[in-house]
Amino acid sequence: MPASSFGESSAHIRRRRVAHYLRTESGAAVLLVIVTVVALVWANSPLSNAYFELWHLDVGFNFGPLRLHMDLHHWVNDGLMVVFFFLIGLEVRQEFAHGSLRDRSRARLALIAGVTGVVLPALVYVLIVKLAGSEGLHGWGAVVGTDTAFMLGTLAIVGPRLSGQLRVFLLTLTVVDDFLAVSIIGIVYSEEIRIVPLLIALASLVGLWLLGRTRQWRATPYVLIVIVLWFATVYSGIHASLAGMAAGLLIPAYATQRHGVVAARQLFRDFWQSPSAASARAVDCGLSRGISVNERLHEFLRLPTALLIVPIFALANAGVDVRGGLLAEAFGSPVTWGVIAGLVLGKLLGIGLTTLVAVRLGLGRLPEGVGVGSVFGGAALSGIGFTVSLLIIGLAFGTTSDLGRQATVGVLVSMVFATLLGWLIFKVAAQRWGEKTADLPMVLEPPVDPEIDHIRGPEDAQLTLVEYVDFECAYCAHATGSWDDLRAHFGDDLRYVVRHLPHHPHGPIAARASEAAANQGMFWPWLDFVFTRQHALEREHLIGYAAELGLDVERFIADLDSPAVIERVERDLASAVASGAHATPTFFVEGRRLRGSYDARTVTAVLEASRRGTRTQEVPS
């Protein structure tokens, strides 16, 4: 019995590990490679007829005057893939609302590199095909796009060990890339336009905009309008990918507001005190109100898109029958080499060189920690076109035509070349230029110094937790109650250190006030007191708090603007920059920056893992 139980437990653990891996970007990329190989093997096996017959199977419905019939291949490309492009639109809206595109310098750099990363590959393709005097110029759109998910997954496999900042840069870049690529699909590769369905589609977009203006927080009205938009777009003759992108752009996104979180907490307290169906529904609605409908839809669609929709698309589009001399024919075709050169060389030079020149000219700035080698490595990986490329090939040539099959071979070969080139550039950058990471620093610098740092708990405690705080930050541990949970769990086993990272309007003066209180031995009472009064942090409020706590007010006022206190706060600011802390709260467990969630349960689990010596988060050596 024990052996059997152990076997079942081991199998369960293996399944859980596989499921966890598939949820990562690298896992999704590996799944896509596997599905692509399956499609190629199936299309070249004795069962190849079944493969092609499956995707040409007619599927449709009649509902009163509405009639929609397409083969299965079109249902995938014009139906399922709309969700993929809708997801891209959601991400673009998030980046503009509270992401990296709010930074004008980064947005300008992404726009410049994104545009040239679309234009140059297209020019390379046209040049090669035109010089060869070959047909196939209409397929230039196959080289303009980047498969964001595939590219980021490949980056996780072949890129630097820590590449968070490079990932942000590439994601910002592909936002522009994807927007332009989808616009090209909608404008260049659409069929004959029908006016009435087009007007209905435009009215649907206006409806989405109006819903956003009214701050509608429920997802259902948006989803219903998007469904109408899709139907109208399919009937209009415009490719549905453009509708998906446009719809995603119109779904409102905004940063989570503190008052929404507080309201949800009160609703949960009501449920805790009097559990009922009504109070449970109120909690559910309260939680939904606290997060933008954009982020909720994105979270709901992200995994199904990565693990189901895109793999199905790959299965439907990557199956090329290379028997009968197709490979020899493809490698002798200007279309194949136009696709390869456009995606591999065009993306590398269009993104890499343009980024370098733009930075040198002061037109933009790279994220901290990202070097030139990392930029070119990421530019090389941007040559993984796959999803957008295969979609445009189907629209331009048809997947079963000779030109379509040759272009598809070019896309698949370019994926291999782009991956190998990116891997090589990352290796050279690490060995020659020391670019072993492309991320913010991960190690606390300088280490905790009991003579300088503010420490709560025994100085020789087994565990150390450092938090960078801003007294106006609504999510720091003392503001949310996380610290109380941590102290209750670890007691004297935990040494807690606070450093300043003021970035809110009242943050600097509040930080100086805490140091003025520290000069009178009252740092921790001050911190506990002021974090409950974040709504009132003007100078006169802080002086009033000093009086309430029994401090020497005259000395407090003198210290508030003293050079020594200012220098003490600036020391912590310099430490934050050197340690990769750029927002509050930022936690360091045993001198290593914590990434991801920072709720009390997560921080407790990481501290316990450190105590057991099983923490796996990577840190540069």
Swiss-Prot record:
Segments forming domain Thioredoxin: 431-578
Disulfide bonds listed in the record: none
Catalytic activity annotation: Na(+)(in) + 2 H(+)(out) = Na(+)(out) + 2 H(+)(in)
Membrane-spanning intervals of the chain: 27-47, 72-92, 109-129, 139-159, 168-188, 192-212, 223-243, 300-320, 339-359, 375-395, 409-429
InterPro entries linked: Na/H_antiporter_dom_sf (IPR023171), NhaA (IPR004670), Thioredoxin-like_fold (IPR012336), Thioredoxin-like_sf (IPR036249), Thioredoxin_domain (IPR013766)
Principal location class: membrane
UniProt xrefs under NCBIfam families: NhaA
Name of the protein in question: Na(+)/H(+) antiporter NhaA
